[in-house]
């Protein structure tokens, strides 16, 4: 291939109007090389070049204008670095703020010693006016009283249930055991006497803890039901505005979306739907959008940049929609948000944190801003996201559950917590100034798996905001906030693995100075969300062991040397059934109350009353089948976190997010084996006891089957057609979700795969990636040598053998990117393996709109 042919092929790749393309073909049909074409495309500005292969840098502005002219804000987005290279202004000018964390003092004894020695540091706290104190004290007194009521109800209910449990257990002779007399008798006899009572004591303790946990959830749901049934909430944060007040022009809001190796097409589809919804309210001037990327996959990074430019072009969002990719991924998501606050936080009064799958309506966002304006003591206002958008059977069950039962628990949380509530890390508005001043997160001291950067940052940030005197509220009755759920059980468990470790880490902050009691309780409930799994497993294991002892060992009727009457093991099935029924009521009554509430307000959007109750039964069946499976996985997560083990989840790519049988048996095989052994052992030992364990053991035996079938979109869509597991967001979808689905479909059609190779070969993508790369240093011989070494290293390999780190280094430097681009085009025979690999890629040709 000669130079003229290569040049003509390059012209064909440019998104030129037909007349301009023909003129260039005529001009370069002779032997002119590619460098002359770049010079012809340049704007005449001077670019410092250390190598002839840097020549593509001069044509970057023109190539960008050809592909994304409407996305460059009339050229205002283009700037120059100190060497004259084109730099795309993807972020506004930096106005730095100081954001530093206070070191954690997790040892109360050390803190007490510092206090008596005068070394204690006062906490940074916001001073409130007398009026603000009076307004806050009103709801704080109510909240405190309500929490005492919750505590009394939970403890009273637990005490009664534990007493019943004690009377049910077969061995009732603890009072007759004399440890001093046992010292002089045979050791084996002592063990035989004590073992049943030790097992029973363990069972009783675990039962009390678990029942208390269930009871707290029951009372939370019940209060939420009453709150929603009445429909009037004097202390609702949403009641503080009428909803039509003009937004304060001095209070601007940033919508920030931290992402990391996400589905690019879905991210920017939801972002566009949110942007257009805000625009429809007429309040767009009060908002800016930031995409904050921590992605480290080069293909995804290039796809993100192109998707951002496409979005800016299509909605006219240049100068309002910004994009940044961090080089140093410090402290994960919380560090990404902190970096934004340090650089641009001073420019905004509020920020709304979005997840990669978040969609929010313009009405919801403007309402959150109005609530912040109306409540100057509110630091965080959390919306209640509604799950939607997934089609697998598993996700549809979860969507139905969160949509039907979720409002009860969210309203119940608000009832008990009021302005000392949760923050879930997304779909919430935050007051930026106090967040900068008080919510920077120091790493946890020490070594091991529970030290270092905090993983679950949201609960901690809410606790710090409240410690500083700012309110944290849940706007549980505010519509227009949406999210998506994991499509299958294994994907959910990957997320739970991170959350489990993060919540266990957070518990180290339980005794930190100044934390509000409610947020100490939040740390405790966060731990119990996962610690309840091994406790439940231990409860079942001890119950099984007690049954083994009861069946195989001869009972010890006489526990004292001169005991006149034997102690008979007893069994009171009527009390056991009553207690079992009571526990089921606590677990399932909130679900029934949720359905009653839906019926009272109209069940048409759920498929009608009959379909709603059938859906309830289907969801309850799934919850029964999946609860033991989650129990075992969460038990492994907790144990591995305490032992410092790393649990690896490397799932293969799956079509439609379906779980293949091979992965299901790999993940659930041990549970299947345990279920078979457990069931077989109990059937051999005592068939009657097997019926009590049947929901557990048969769920474990069926776990691979349930995991695979529930991950299938076909079954989920069949339920949707039958109007089962239907939610209002499907029967009458809001325009934001309809728009998200449409934009997602369009984005899929123009999806950019193999982004790194396109950044090397495609003129438009190369120009974009080059303009968004940064070269912070002026000419330096060591830097030039390093650049040349990287380029030669890459070209000496096959393209598929270039590792991720080298790809990131190449695409992050405009000079190395230009050299690679020029060499593979100007020396096609020398680098034929690169060209042939690019030509065989399955990705469609990138065509940018004129």
Swiss-Prot record:
PANTHER family, per database record: CELLULOSE SYNTHASE CATALYTIC SUBUNIT A [UDP-FORMING] (PTHR43867), GLUCANS BIOSYNTHESIS GLUCOSYLTRANSFERASE H (PTHR43867:SF5)
The keyword Transmembrane helix appears for this protein: yes
Protein name: Glucans biosynthesis glucosyltransferase H
UniProt KW Transmembrane helix keyword: yes
GO MF annotations, alphabetized: hexosyltransferase activity
Primary role: Involved in the biosynthesis of osmoregulated periplasmic glucans (OPGs). Seems to be required for pathogenicity.
Assigned EC number: 2.4.1.-
Family of the protein in this entry: Belongs to the glycosyltransferase 2 family. OpgH subfamily.
Keywords: Cell inner membrane, Cell membrane, Glycosyltransferase, Membrane, Transferase, Transmembrane, Transmembrane helix
GO cellular component assignments: plasma membrane
Biological processes per GO annotation: glucan biosynthetic process
Main location: membrane
Alphabetized Pfam families for the sequence: Glycos_transf_2
InterPro entries, alphabetized: Glucans_biosynth_gluTrFase_H, Glyco_trans_2-like, Glycosyltr_2/OpgH_subfam, Nucleotide-diphossugar_trans
Membrane topology reported for the UniProt record: Multi-pass membrane protein
């Amino acid at each position: 291939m000669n130079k003229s042919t290569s040049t003509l092929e390059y012209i064909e790749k440019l998104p030129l109007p037909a007349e301009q393309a023909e003129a260039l073909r005529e001009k370069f049909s002779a032997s002119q090389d590619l460098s002359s074409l770049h010079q012809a495309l340049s704007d005449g500005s001077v670019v410092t070049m250390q190598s002839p292969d840097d020549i593509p840098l001069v044509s970057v502005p023109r190539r960008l204008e050809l592909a994304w002219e409407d996305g460059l804000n009339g050229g205002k987005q283009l700037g120059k670095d100190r060497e004259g290279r084109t730099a795309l202004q993807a972020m506004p000018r930096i106005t730095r703020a100081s954001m530093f964390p206070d070191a954690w003092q997790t040892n109360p004894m050390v803190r007490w010693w510092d206090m008596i020695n005068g070394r204690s540091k006062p906490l940074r706290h916001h001073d409130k006016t007398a009026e603000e104190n009076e307004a806050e004290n009103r709801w704080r007194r109510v909240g405190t009283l309500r929490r005492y009521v919750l505590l009394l109800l939970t403890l009273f209910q637990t005490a009664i249930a534990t007493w019943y449990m004690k009377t049910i257990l077969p061995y009732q002779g603890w009072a007759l055991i004399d440890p001093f007399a046992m010292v002089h008798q045979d050791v084996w006899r002592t063990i035989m006497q004590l073992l049943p009572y030790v097992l029973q004591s363990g069972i009783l303790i675990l039962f009390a803890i678990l029942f208390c946990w269930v009871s707290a959830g029951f009372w939370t749901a019940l209060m939420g039901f009453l709150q929603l049934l009445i429909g009037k909430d004097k202390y609702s944060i949403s009641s503080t505005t009428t909803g039509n007040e003009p937004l304060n022009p001095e209070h601007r809001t940033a919508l920030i979306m931290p992402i990391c190796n996400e589905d690019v097409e879905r991210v920017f589809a939801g972002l566009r739907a949110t942007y257009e919804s805000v625009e429809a309210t007429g309040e767009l001037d009060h908002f800016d959008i930031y995409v904050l990327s921590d992605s480290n996959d080069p293909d995804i990074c290039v796809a993100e940049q192109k998707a951002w430019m496409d979005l800016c072009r299509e909605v006219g969002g240049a100068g309002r929609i910004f994009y940044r990719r961090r080089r140093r991924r410090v402290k994960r998501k919380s560090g990404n948000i902190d970096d934004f606050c340090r650089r641009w936080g001073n420019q905004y009064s509020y920020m709304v944190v979005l997840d990669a799958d978040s969609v929010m309506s313009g009405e919801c966002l403007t309402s959150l801003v109005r609530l912040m304006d109306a409540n100057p003591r509110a630091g965080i206002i959390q919306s209640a996201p509604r799950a939607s958008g997934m089609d697998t059977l598993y996700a549809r069950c979860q969507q139905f559950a969160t949509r039907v039962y979720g409002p009860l628990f969210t309203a119940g949380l608000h009832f008990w917590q009021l302005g000392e509530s949760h923050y879930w890390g997304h779909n919430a508005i935050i007051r930026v100034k106090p967040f900068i001043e008080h919510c920077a997160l120091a790493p946890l001291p020490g070594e091991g798996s529970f030290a270092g950067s905090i993983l679950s940052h949201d609960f901690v940030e809410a606790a710090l905001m409240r410690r500083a005197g700012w309110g944290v509220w849940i706007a549980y009755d505010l519509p227009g906030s949406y999210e998506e759920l994991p499509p299958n059980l294994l994907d959910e468990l990957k997320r739970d693995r991170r959350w489990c470790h993060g919540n266990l880490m957070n518990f180290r902050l339980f005794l930190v100075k100044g934390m509000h009691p409610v947020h100490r309780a939040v740390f405790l409930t966060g731990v119990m969300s996962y610690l309840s799994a091994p406790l439940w497993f231990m409860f079942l294991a001890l119950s099984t062991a007690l049954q083994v002892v009861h069946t195989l060992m001869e009972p010890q009727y006489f526990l004292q040397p001169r005991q006149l009457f034997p102690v008979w093991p007893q069994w009171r099935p009527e009390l056991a059934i009553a207690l079992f029924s009571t526990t089921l009521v606590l677990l399932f009554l909130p679900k029934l109350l949720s359905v009653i509430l839906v019926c009272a307000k109209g069940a048409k959007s759920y498929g009608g009353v009959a379909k709603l109750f059938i859906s309830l039964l289907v969801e309850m069946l799934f919850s029964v089948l999946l609860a033991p499976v989650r129990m075992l996985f969460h038990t492994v997560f907790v144990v591995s976190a305490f032992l410092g083990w790393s649990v690896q989840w490397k799932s293969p790519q799956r079509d439609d997010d379906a779980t293949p049988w091979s992965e299901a048996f790999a993940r659930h095989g041990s549970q299947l084996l345990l279920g078979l052994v457990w069931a077989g052992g109990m059937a051999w030992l005592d068939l009657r006891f097997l019926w009590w364990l049947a929901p557990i053991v048969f769920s474990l035996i069926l776990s691979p089957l349930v995991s695979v079938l529930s991950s299938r979109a076909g079954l989920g869509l069949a339920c949707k057609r039958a109007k089962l597991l239907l939610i209002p967001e499907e029967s009458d979808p809001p325009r934001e979700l309809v728009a998200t689905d449409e934009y997602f479909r369009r984005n899929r059609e123009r999806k950019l795969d193999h982004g790194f190779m396109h950044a090397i070969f495609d003129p438009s993508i190369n120009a974009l990636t080059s303009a968004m790369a940064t070269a912070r240093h002026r000419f330096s011989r060591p830097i030039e040598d390093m650049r040349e070494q990287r380029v030669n290293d890459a070209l000496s390999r096959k393209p598929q053998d270039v590792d991720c780190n080298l790809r990131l280094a190449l695409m992050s430097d405009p000079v190395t990117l230009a050299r690679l681009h020029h060499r593979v085009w100007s020396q096609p025979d020398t680098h034929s393996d690169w060209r042939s690999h690019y030509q065989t890629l399955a990705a469609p040709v990138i065509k940018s709109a004129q």
